[in-house]
Amino acid sequence: MGRVIRDFFTQPTLVVAESLLGKILVHKPRKGFCYKGMIVETEAYLGNGDDACHASRKMTPRNSVMFRNPGTIYVYFTYGAHNLLNIVTEPEGTAGAVLIRAMEPVEGIELMKKNRKTDKVINLMNGPGKLTQAMEISLQQNGSSLHDTTLYLEEGTTIAGSCIETTPRVGISKSTDLLWRKYISDNPYVSKASPLPPTKKKRIVLES
């Protein structure tokens, strides 16, 4: 399975957010360890016109990575407990990123169980803080490139547009009208139920 090319991340942020669904995130933190998960849920964030974005006001030391080249890894620590994984998507100097909200475990599941301290596979990666814990993703990856590290993306399965739901983002209090959350219909690993009725509800059909 080939890696996702650099130009993929230069597409508009909302396009990347949807196109990431079905892609395989791979992390090889050290020899003999390999984690893989299929992305099933994302959220887009933009510095311009999006008050829920960390960079909506100005660049700060914390959010400066969001202004780097597309394909840069942006990891931030939140709620005093969780590392959240984002991928930078806008041209250098313009803030924008896609949050990886949930994934379906593919490889390294037994190791993920140990990292998450649970035997329930359904709970391994069904949330942005859970998936980073499961895959040993931390602030050490912040600012790295998906093309030059042990954390990278592989081409996975193309998800038909009719099988993708679009809703408001979860857990925010600003810019709640923006329908910038994308997830695969009926996938059990999605982080939580939609905050509003989904735009469409159809049986999943995967395109090869």
Curated annotation (Swiss-Prot):
EC number(s) given by UniProt: 3.2.2.-
Pfam families xref list: Pur_DNA_glyco
Enzyme class: hydrolase
CDD domains with a match to the protein in the record: AAG
InterPro entries reported in the protein's UniProt record: Formyl_transferase-like_C_sf (IPR011034), MPG (IPR003180), MPG_sf (IPR036995)
Keywords associated with the record: DNA damage, DNA repair, Hydrolase
Entry-linked Gene3D superfamilies: Methylpurine-DNA glycosylase (MPG)
SUPFAM superfamilies in the record: FMT C-terminal domain-like (SSF50486)
Keyword DNA repair set for record: yes
HAMAP family reported for this sequence: 3MGH
Protein name, UniProt field: Putative 3-methyladenine DNA glycosylase
Organism: Prosthecochloris aestuarii (strain DSM 271 / SK 413)
Lineage of origin: Bacteria, Pseudomonadati, Chlorobiota, Chlorobiia, Chlorobiales
